[in-house]
Amino acid sequence: MEGSWRDVLAVLVILAQLTVSGSSYQIIEGPRNVTALKGSEARFNCTVTHGWKLIMWALNGIVELSLTSQKPIITSNRFTSASYNSTDSFISEMIIHNVQLNDSGPVQCSLQNSNVFGFAFLSVQVMGTLNIPSSNLIVTEGEPCNVTCYAVGWTPLPNISWELEVPVSHSSYYSFLEPGNSLRVLSVLDLTPLGNGTLTCVAEMKDLQASESLTVNLTVVQPPPDSIGGEGQALPTWAIILLAVAFSLLLILIIALIIIFCCCCVSRREKEESTYQNEIRKSANVRTGKADPETWLKSGKENYGYKSDEARAAQIASLPPKSGEVSLPEQRSSLPQQELDKHRPSPVTHPRVSFDIASPQKIRNVTIV
């Protein structure tokens, strides 16, 4: 009985010693963050003081590797260990082989009976593929063309650039996500080649010194003879816009000139018609004035010194005839009577001559004021 109690007491003492001794161990330096490429290896180091009894490695909260002073305890072939001793510390290394995307997460290093832990984070990146629709491109010399490079299956999305081994007069490129597919990025190269060469699309990982490239051949041919000076010499966009604006302004100017010309013609015709009508009116007025002089007299003043011919004739007729006055027969006698007088013998008397002064010719003067 006493022997059994002694054995139990010895075990308790040993456990107490392990607990006390284990609690005095420390982690000097924990693991550091690692970014690894899918399919590669990831290494984590944990530095502790001497005298340790048990070191445990956990990934995403699951212990994948344990290490005692005698040997490591391995739960998976993807996880192995290495160790390094120094004068004042011990370094334990956990190696993760063939890293997968789902391995991304926290990594923990801990000691038995210790509340001190070392933490790090594992980031896994995936290198996808590059694709250019044609590996041999044939373009026309001096004509703009574009080449598209597709990056598919990259995590995270890469940075895409171009390497040109061909003489060009102009080159530029831009990248963007494919609409409807956030895991596919496109890069478009615009260039104007002048000779043969190669084009290389390069995709680089953001946090790793890793890249993928794809090269295509570019063959430049001469433009066909019928296109020289024609389609091959197409005007730039700014020149086409300038010509369109110039033609529009010219058309507007022509329309305005036509409108002005028509207005001038109509105005001139109306003026000629108005002048012609005025001339007609003047001619009519002149004719009317000649035919009806009373209209002229109405515009003048009355001459009170004027006497009519009838009044003078009546005054002269009332005077008695003077002696020795000879009167001629009136001209109003008929022609037969005159013939008879010619055949009759006339008495021998002195001829008598009379002058009709009753109606001398008068000139009527009108004074117009």
Swiss-Prot record:
Cytoplasmic-side positions: 261-369
Entry keyword annotation includes Transmembrane: yes
Transmembrane intervals: 240-260
Cell location: Apical cell membrane; Cell junction, Tight junction
Key words, A-Z: Cell junction, Cell membrane, Disulfide bond, Glycoprotein, Immunoglobulin domain, Membrane, Repeat, Signal, Tight junction, Transmembrane, Transmembrane helix
Glycan-bearing residues: 33, 45, 146, 196, 217
PROSITE patterns linked to this entry: IG_LIKE
GO molecular function: PDZ domain binding
InterPro entries documented for this protein: Ig-like_dom, Ig-like_dom_sf, Ig-like_fold, Ig_sub
Signal peptide start and end residues: 1-24
Tissue distribution of the protein: In kidney, it is found in glomeruli and in the proximal tubules (at protein level).
GO BP term (any one): cell-cell adhesion
Membrane topology type: Single-pass type I membrane protein
SMART domains attached to this UniProt entry: IG
Matching PANTHER family: IMMUNOGLOBULIN SUPERFAMILY MEMBER 5
Descriptive protein name: Immunoglobulin superfamily member 5
Gene source species: Rattus norvegicus
